[in-house]
């Protein structure tokens, strides 16, 4: 079965005034759909199916036919990255995390303010197109990072739990070249409950439920 564009759990205008409806619609139905189409075409051209989750596919790119490595990296990464992005934003988002995620951000990253400063710098410091990330390393540690283009932390063995798209298509209609304003707007829609859920899943997969 080919990969499909995931439906959003909210309307395109639900994140306004922080992220406008037109940007959301174009970003979802055109940009993300293009990545889905490109990934399906690459796999079909190589005679491969798409039965596994795209996240699993990205972890094993070296095992795929060399001729499709670039397409899977770009289109598969774009599909996985955007699929995460839609879920970690919410009309009722914003604020700060609580519970275990908040405690571990405090212990490992110096607290929420320090995390947000590092995440902002990752987003601002990414030259050109790319992403800012909060990930879980194979050692079960939180890490702030960035990646170029549509590269996913999954390709390096890390598990993303929060991601921000800093390609211009993600913000230019509303914010033009004002990337700092876009980053600040993103914090107002982050769904920390979803990020925390992803954190618990990542730790569980590493066998660190009680760590």
From Swiss-Prot:
The name this protein goes by in its record: Superoxide dismutase [Mn]
Molecular function in Gene Ontology: metal ion binding; superoxide dismutase activity
Gene name tied to this protein: sodA
One Pfam family per UniProt: Sod_Fe_N
Annotated source species: Bordetella pertussis (strain Tohama I / ATCC BAA-589 / NCTC 13251)
Superkingdom assignment: Bacteria
Family, similarity comment: Belongs to the iron/manganese superoxide dismutase family.
One GO CC term, this protein: cytoplasm
Self-association state and partner proteins as the record states: Homodimer.
Annotated Mn(2+) binding sites: 27, 82, 165, 169
Cofactor: Mn(2+)
Protein EC: 1.15.1.1
Gene3D superfamilies according to UniProt: Fe,Mn superoxide dismutase (SOD) domain, Iron/manganese superoxide dismutase, C-terminal domain
Keywords: Manganese, Metal-binding, Oxidoreductase
Cross-referenced SUPFAM superfamilies: Fe,Mn superoxide dismutase (SOD), C-terminal domain (SSF54719), Fe,Mn superoxide dismutase (SOD), N-terminal domain (SSF46609)
Co-factor note (free text): Binds 1 Mn(2+) ion per subunit.
Chain's role: Destroys superoxide anion radicals which are normally produced within the cells and which are toxic to biological systems.
Reaction(s) catalysed by this chain's protein: 2 superoxide + 2 H(+) = H2O2 + O2
InterPro entries from the UniProt entry: Mn/Fe_SOD, Mn/Fe_SOD_BS, Mn/Fe_SOD_C, Mn/Fe_SOD_N, Mn/Fe_SOD_N_sf, SOD_C_sf
